[in-house]
Amino acid sequence: MLDVNFFDELRIGLATADDIRTWSHGEVKKPETINYRTLKPEKDGLFCEKIFGPTRDWECYCGKYKRVRFKGIICERCGVEVTRAKVRRERMGHIELAAPVTHIWYFKGVPSRLGYLLDLAPKDLEKVIYFAAYMITFVDEERRTRDLPSLEAHVSVERQQTENRRDSDLEARAKKLETDLAELEAEGAKADVRRKVREGAEREMKQLRDRAQREIDRLDEVWSRFKNLKVQDLEGDELLYRELRDRFGTYFDGCMGAAALQKRLESFDLDEEAERLREIIRTGKGQKKTRALKRLKVVSAFLQTSNKPKGMVLDCVPVIPPDLRPMVQLDGGRFATSDLNDLYRRVINRNNRLKRLLDLGAPEIIVNNEKRMLQEAVDALFDNGRRGRPVTGPGNRPLKSLSDMLKGKQGRFRQNLLGKRVDYSARSVIVVGPQLKLHQCGLPKAMALELFKPFVMKRLVDLNHAQNIKSAKRMVERGRTVVYDVLEEVIAEHPVLLNRAPTLHRLGIQAFEPQLVEGKAIQIHPLVCTAFNADFDGDQMAVHLPLSAEAQAEARILMLSSNNILKPADGRPVTMPTQDMVLGLFFLTTDDEGRNVKGADRAFGSTAEATMAFDARELSLQAKVDIRFPVGTMPPRGWVPPVAEEGEPEYQPGDTFRLRTTLGRALFNELLPEDYPFVDYSVGKKQLSEIVNDLAERYPKVIVAATLDNLKAAGFHWATRSGVTVAISDVVVPEAKKAIVKGYEEQDEKVQKQYERGLITKDERTQELIAIWTKATNEVAEAMNANFPKTNPIFMMVDSGARGNMMQMRQIAGMRGLVSNAKNETIPRPIKASFREGLTVLEYFISTHGARKGLADTALRTADSGYLTRRLVDVSQDVIIREEDCGTDRGLKLKIAVKGADGVLRKTDDVETSVYARMLAEDVVVDGKVIAPANVDLGDVLIDALVGAGVEEVKTRSVLTCESAVGTCAFCYGRSLATGKLVDIGEAVGIIAAQSIGEPGTQLTMRTFHTGGVAGDDITQGLPRVVELFEARTPKGVAPISEAKGRVRIEETEKTKKLVVTPDDGSDETAFPISKRARLLVGEGDPVEVGQKLTVGATNPHDVLRILGQRAVQVHLVGEVQKVYNSQGVSIHDKHIEIIIRQMLRRVTIIESGDAELLPGELVERSKFETENRRVVTEGGHPASGRPQLMGITKASLATESWLSAASFQETTRVLTDAAINAKSDSLIGLKENVIIGKLIPAGTGLSRYRNIRVEPTEEAKAAMYSAVGYDDIDYSPFGTGSGQAVPLEDYDYGPYNQ
C-alpha cells in the first residue's frame, strides 16, 4: 500500500483500457458470485479468489496450502496466491468488453465533453452511441476526387438506363392498350368496359413512371450524399446508408455505437482543432465565439495533459475489489448483497451473450441491439439513472451505482473519509458537577475503566499485580479492588475530550482532567455549559481519549477548558456565571436602598469582624455599613480618599482605607484577585460580564480560572442562602390595569364608530387599533414594573439577568397584548388577560398560531443554519496563517470614535467588532508625536488611550488587504480572539471564521417579514438574508444605484415608473425601471453621486463591485451581514466575515488573454493570474487583463483548485469529470484534502515547520563544547528545548490550584 506521508500531490486522470488491465489481477468472465452450497466464491466469478485473493488469511481456495509459512506461493491446483485476506480490499479485476462502450460521465455530463471535443450536439451523439444513426468515420477524399468524373458518368449511364427502361415499358404498355381496345371494339363491348380498361392501363403506366422516378431520385440522393460526404456526418436512414455502402463502400467507412466514436477519436487531430478554434476566437463574434471558447477549453485540456481522448471510450471495465461490494449471509440462509454486484452481473451477462452472438455470426441488427444493451448496462453501473429510467431492484428501488457510492452524505467522501467512527470513546447523560474545578469533569468509574483499559492493564503488569497482559485483562474484567487504585493513578493528569453534538464551534469539544465518580452520568462544570450549549434535561455527551503523548499535550495546552475562556467569535469571555450563580451574586451585592435592615450604619474594623456579626444574626448582608479594608486592597475606581485630619498621613495607594459599603459586597470582592479595584455596586449579569472580561484582559489564565471557580461557588452558596422561591402569589397583577384597559377600550370603540360611519378606511382602522393597544400594553407593563417590590423573587431574577425578561413578565402579570395571525399580520384584537388571570377560549386560540410557528421555524432554522455552516467551512477551510508578516502597507481606515452633540469624543458602537484585536497598519501621530506605533495590537486599553488623545480614525491591517499568496499572515489577521494573543502561524482561521458565523445562525430569525403599512414590500431578513449575501445573489426588490455623477429625472406613465440619470459629463443617460410602489430616496432634479442608492431596498453586490470596485463591495457585504447579526444581539468580529468575503473575491475573469496562457472568459485564482502576468511581462509580452469576480460561497467552493475538496462538497460527479479531463493535480494545501487521504492536516501542530524540527545546539553551546577543558566546565544552560521557542509553562501551572 501507498504511504500517505510520502507524497505531496494527488492527480486524477482518464484511464485507458491498458491502464485498467495493468491494475487488474485477472478477468472476470462469469456473472456468478458464490456457490450457495459451499458458500465459497465461484471460479472466474465476481468474487473469484484467484483474481482477488484468498477469503481466509494464508489459505488457498482448495486448502492445499495453509499457514503463513507458504506466504507468496501461488497454488498450482487452484491458482490462488497465499496471502492476507485484506488484499480483497485492494485487488481489482476487469471485464473485457466484446464491443467498446462510452463512459456516461463524458457523454451525458453537462456540458457533454465528448460533444464539445467532436463538435456534436448531445442528441446526435446519443443517436450514434445508442445505434440510431451511422457515423462516417473515414472518407478517402483523394480517391473520390480522382474518380468523381468516371463515377458521375457511371451514375449518368445508370440514370439513362432507368429512363430508357421506363420509356420502353411505357411504350409496350401503350401498344398493349391499343390492341386490347381494338379487340374490345371488334367484340362490340360497351363504352363502360372500354373506359375501365383504359383507366386500368393508365394506372399501371403511372405506377411505372412513379417507380422509375423514385429510382432516379434515390440515385440522385445517393450520388449527392456521396459527393458531399465528410467525416463525422451522421446518417439516420439505414436504407440510404446501405445503398451508399453497396455502391461506394470502398471510398468511405462508417459505423454505429461507441466503436464509431472510438475510431473518430483515434484519428482526431487535437493540434489542428486547437489552431482552428483559436482562429475563430480571434475573428468570430457572439455565439460562435462563445462555443469556440468552450470547445477550446476541452481541446486544450487534452493537449496540455497526458490524457488521451480515447480514454472516454472503454474497451474494458474495471471491477472494484470484492470487499468493497460485499455479500453477507442473513439469518435464514438468504444473502444480502451490494447493488454493485447486480449491476456487474448485468454487464457480464450481456457481454457474454454479445460474444456468443458475434461467434455465431448473428445478423447485424441483433448484434447492434445487444451492443446497445451492453452500453446501457455499463451506463447503469457507472451512473444509474443518468440516462433513461434507472435500473431498479426489489420494490422498485433504483440500484446504487458507482457514482452514488461517492455522492451525498452517505457517499464515500462524507461518510467514510471526512467523518469516521473512532474507538476509545464513550457516551453518557450529563449532570451538573458544582464541586468540580473549571478544568475537571466527573467520569463514571465503569466508563473510565473501559476507556483506560490498556493503560490500566499495562500498569498492573508494571506493578507486578499481574504476571502478563492476559491475567491483567482478567483482573480488570472481574473488577478487583486494586484495579480501581491503579485506575486513579493512570487517569491522573491524563486529559479526556468531551464533546456535545451539535458541535457548532470549536468550544463544542474541550479537554478536562477526569475525576472518578460513582453512578453512570458524566459530571460537567456549570461554567462550561454556555460553550457547549448544554443543559441537564437529558443531554448526552461523548468522551474521547487522547492516546499519544503529543495528543495529550495538545489537549492539555490548547483544549483544556480553563484555557478556553474566550469565545472565538468576538474575543469576549464565554465561561460566565449564569442563572443561579448570577442570582446568588446579585443577592450578595444588592444594598438595602432605604429599607430598614438589621445592623445598618455600624462600623467594622475588617470584613472578618462584619462576618462575625452576620453569623451572629446581628447584621444583614445588604445593610450599608463602614468597613476598613487591609493593606493591598484596591479602592473602587473613581474613589476619592477623605481629607486627612491634622497629624494623620495622606492616603497613599495600597494603604488601608475605610469604605461605606455592604458586607455582601465586601465578601464578593474577596472572590476577586487582591489587586482588582473594589466593586461597589450591584452585580447582575451585565456587570459580571464586564468584570470577567476585564479579568480575562488583565490577568493570566490561572488566576482567571481560579476567580471564576470562586464566583461559581459563591454564586451557588448565596443563591441557596437567599431562599429565593417562586410562587403564584409572587405574580402581582397591577391594580391600575383595569382602569388602563377601560380607558383604551373607550378609544377602541371611538375608532370602530368612525369606521362604521365611513370616516376612515379598513386599513386606517387596523393601524389605529394596533397603535392604541400597543400603547395600552406598554402602559400596563409600566404599571406592573412600578408595582413589583425590589425583593420580589421573580423581579430579582429578571433584574439580575439570571432568567427571563420584562416581556415575559408582562405576559404573566400584565397583559399578553397583540398577536399575529397565520399571514404574519397583527390581529387588531388584543389579548387583555395575563397568564396569571387566565385566557378565554378565543384568546387562547388566537395565540396558538404564534407558538406553533415558533416551533416550526426553529426546526427549519436548525437545518438551514447547519447547511450554511457547511458551505462556509468549505469555502474557507484552506485559509490558514502561513507567515508572520506579508509586508503589505495597505489596510483599512476604521472609525474608533465619534463626536457627540456635546462635542465629546466617544467610542463608536461597533468598535468591539471592527477595530478591537487588530494590528495598526501605520503609526498613530497626534501633534507630531507618535502615540501608538505600527504593528501594535489594538486592545481595550490602547483604544481608550487613543480616544482619550482625540483620535477618531485609525488605519489597521486586515485580511482583505493581506498579500500572502496562500492563506493569510498573522499581522493582517491580528489577535487570535480565542487566546487574546497574536495569532500563531498554523492557526486555521478560516474554519474559526466559518464556525463563528454559522454557530449563531440558529438564533437568527427565519422568513421574510411583512412590513405592512403603505409600502407593503417583503424584506428579507435573518438567516435567509445572510445566505443571500454570502451566495452573492441578486436580492428581491433590488434597489438600483447610480452609475454616474449627474441629476435625476422621474418619468412616470400609467403602468410604469422610470428613474433617469443624466450624467454631468454629457455621456449617455441611464434609465432604471422601478416598481410603482418603490419608495424613492431621490427627488426630481436631485444631484446624485456615483454608486448612490436611488430607492429603498437592498443593493445588488455585483452592481456595487462593477460600479464602485472591490473595496466598496467588501465594506458593503461586511456591513450588511453585521446588520442582520446585530439585530439579533449577536456579536461577531468583522475579521471573520472578511475572511469569507476574501474567499468570495479570490478569482478573476480574464477579459483579454494577451500573451498569457489563459483563455478569455476563464476564471482563475488571483495568485495564478498575477504569477502568469509577471512571467509574461519578464519575457516582454502583453499581460492578460481581467476583472475581479464576486462568487457565492457554493460556487467558490466548487471552483477551488483542490478537486478532492470540491468533490467532497457538492456535485461530486461533475467535479470529478472535470478534474479527470483536465488531469488536475491536488497539491494538498487545504485541510479537507489531507483529512480525506489520511495525512496530518497542514494546520496547527501538523504544519511542516513544527513537525520537521532538528534539535541542534546553539553557536554559543558549540563554542563552549570546543573550549571545554573538563566535564564540569560544560555549561548546558543555553540549550533550552532545542532551537524552537519554549512554551511558557507557568501559564498552565495548576500546582497550587489543584490542592
UniProtKB/Swiss-Prot annotation:
- Could you name the domain of life of the organism this protein comes from? Bacteria
The UniProt annotation places Zn(2+) 2 binding at 886, 962, 969, 972
What name is this protein filed under?
Answer: DNA-directed RNA polymerase subunit beta'
Q: Known catalysed reaction(s)?
A: RNA(n) + a ribonucleoside 5'-triphosphate = RNA(n+1) + diphosphate
Binding of Mg(2+), residues: 535, 537, 539
Entry's family note: Belongs to the RNA polymerase beta' chain family.
Gene Ontology BP terms? DNA-templated transcription
The broad enzyme category this protein falls into is transferase
The ranges of region (Disordered) come to: 385-405
Kindly give the Pfam families that the UniProt entry links to this protein.
RNA_pol_Rpb1_1, RNA_pol_Rpb1_2, RNA_pol_Rpb1_3, RNA_pol_Rpb1_4, RNA_pol_Rpb1_5
Q: PANTHER family in the record, alphabetically?
A: DNA-DIRECTED RNA POLYMERASE (PTHR19376), DNA-DIRECTED RNA POLYMERASE SUBUNIT BETA (PTHR19376:SF54)
Q: What's noted on cofactor binding?
A: Binds 1 Mg(2+) ion per subunit.
Relate the assembly described in the record: The RNAP catalytic core consists of 2 alpha, 1 beta, 1 beta' and 1 omega subunit. When a sigma factor is associated with the core the holoenzyme is formed, which can initiate transcription.
Q: Which HAMAP family match?
A: RNApol_bact_RpoC (MF_01322)
Query: Where, by residue number, does Zn(2+) 1 bind?
Result: 60, 62, 75, 78
Q: Which InterPro entries match?
A: DNA-dir_RpoC_beta_prime (IPR045867), DNA-dir_RpoC_beta_prime_bact (IPR012754), RNA_pol_asu (IPR000722), RNA_pol_N (IPR006592), RNA_pol_Rpb1_1 (IPR007080), RNA_pol_Rpb1_3 (IPR007066), RNA_pol_Rpb1_3_sf (IPR042102), RNA_pol_Rpb1_4 (IPR007083)
Function statement = DNA-dependent RNA polymerase catalyzes the transcription of DNA into RNA using the four ribonucleoside triphosphates as substrates.
Originating organism: Streptomyces griseus subsp. griseus (strain JCM 4626 / CBS 651.72 / NBRC 13350 / KCC S-0626 / ISP 5235)
